[in-house]
């Protein structure tokens, strides 16, 4: 039984993503206690002390410490970020062979502690790893989710903001499917200031004649690789995404976020994790919001599901 009191979060993996996610959780005061676990105990201890040293200047004190898997027993959320930096222009699925062994070991250790909270998977390929963690953990479907296309959706809104010069927070809509090459922008859901995006462009051709939805979608898809090529990895965007998901669950905000969650009949798919709009509550991925997608969008979603499902085969 999941019980949430904004008490305790554990992050497994203190590389760039894990450490930056920890920073976001601490600076926003999202929980009472944050525990860091890493294969290098010294690394986890160093990050914990570095984070804790800024406590005087935080709005709300979060106790940060290094720990071990026994700390997962009473944790509300365990965030899994283990993995390695991908090379530039690589496919996220290429990380599967390396990551699956790490994730399997982590999940086994987490569950051996008696954990009964929510697992938030960040490790890539995140849809495959979320499915694998769900199968391996034996937890209910609501209690295992991945970051999915939440970051991609944020990227879409940012890019639309760049193209139009408007605040990206005015943009509604979702990127759906795999967090990877087969992701797609569900343009039927995208709006700007409450107006369907296609209609917005048509009504403002004098200002936005050069704006192309095809180019926006491609920029969204390749944004991650561009960042990796420029700086060697991504950490701020995904860390903000993780912190947002953690806050939404811990604070029972009931926000709709396109996380990677198990499809069990929704959109005609079964036994696959994909990024789809999902109501997040204190119990995790509470309910999938099934949208009225266009025929083309449904075809793209099914294609994405097939790719993810193929990579899940043989993992157990």
Residue ranges and their predicted role:
Residues 18-19:
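N-terminal Rossmann-fold NAD(P) dinucleotide-binding loop
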Residues 137-142, 153-316:
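C-terminal substrate-binding/catalytic lobe of Rossmann-fold NAD(P)-dependent dehydrogenases
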Residues 33, 37-76, 309-316:
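Conserved N-terminal Rossmann-fold NAD(P) cofactor-binding segment
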Residues 92-157:
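Rossmann-like NAD(P)(H) cofactor-binding subdomain of soluble oxidoreductases
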Residues 7-11:
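Beta1/beta-strand and adjacent pyrophosphate-binding region of the FAD-binding site
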Residues 27-33, 138-140:
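Conserved S-adenosyl-L-methionine
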Residues 14-15:
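Glycine-rich Rossmann-fold phosphate-binding loop(s) that bind the pyrophosphate
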Residues 56-118:
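Rossmann-like NAD(P)-binding element
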């Amino acid at each position: 039984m999941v019980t949430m009191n904004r008490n305790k979060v554990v992050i497994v993996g203190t590389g760039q993503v894990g450490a930056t996610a920890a920073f976001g959780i601490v600076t926003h005061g999202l929980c009472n206690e944050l525990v860091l676990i890493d294969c290098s105990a010294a690394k986890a201890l160093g990050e914990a002390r570095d984070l804790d040293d800024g406590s005087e200047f935080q709005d709300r004190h979060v106790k940060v410490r290094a720990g071990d898997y026994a700390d997962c027993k009473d944790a509300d959320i365990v965030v899994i970020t283990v993995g390695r930096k991908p090379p530039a222009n690589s496919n996220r699925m290429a990380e599967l062979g390396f990551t699956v062994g790490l994730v399997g070991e982590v999940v086994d250790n987490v569950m051996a502690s008696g954990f009964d909270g929510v697992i938030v998977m960040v490790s890539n390929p995140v849809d495959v790893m979320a499915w694998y963690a769900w199968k391996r953990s034996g937890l209910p479907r609501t209690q295992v989710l991945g970051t999915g296309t939440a970051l991609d959706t944020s990227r879409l809104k940012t890019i639309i903001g760049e193209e139009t010069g408007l605040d990206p927070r005015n943009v509604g809509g979702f990127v759906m499917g795999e967090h990877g090459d087969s992701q797609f922008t569900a343009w039927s859901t995208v709006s700007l200031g409450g107006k369907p995006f296609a209609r917005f462009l048509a009504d403002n051709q004098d200002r936005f004649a050069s704006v192309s939805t095809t180019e926006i979608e491609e920029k969204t898809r390749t944004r991650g690789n561009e960042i990796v090529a420029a700086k060697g990895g991504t950490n701020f965007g995904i860390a903000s995404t993780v912190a947002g998901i953690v806050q939404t669950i811990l604070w029972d905000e009931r926000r709709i976020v396109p996380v990677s969650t198990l499809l069990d009949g929704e959109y005609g798919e079964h036994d696959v994790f994909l990024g789809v709009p999902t109501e997040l509550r204190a119990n995790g991925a509470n309910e999938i919001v099934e949208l009225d997608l266009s025929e083309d969008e449904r075809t793209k979603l099914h294609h994405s599901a097939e790719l993810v499902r193929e990579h899940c085969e043989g993992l157990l």
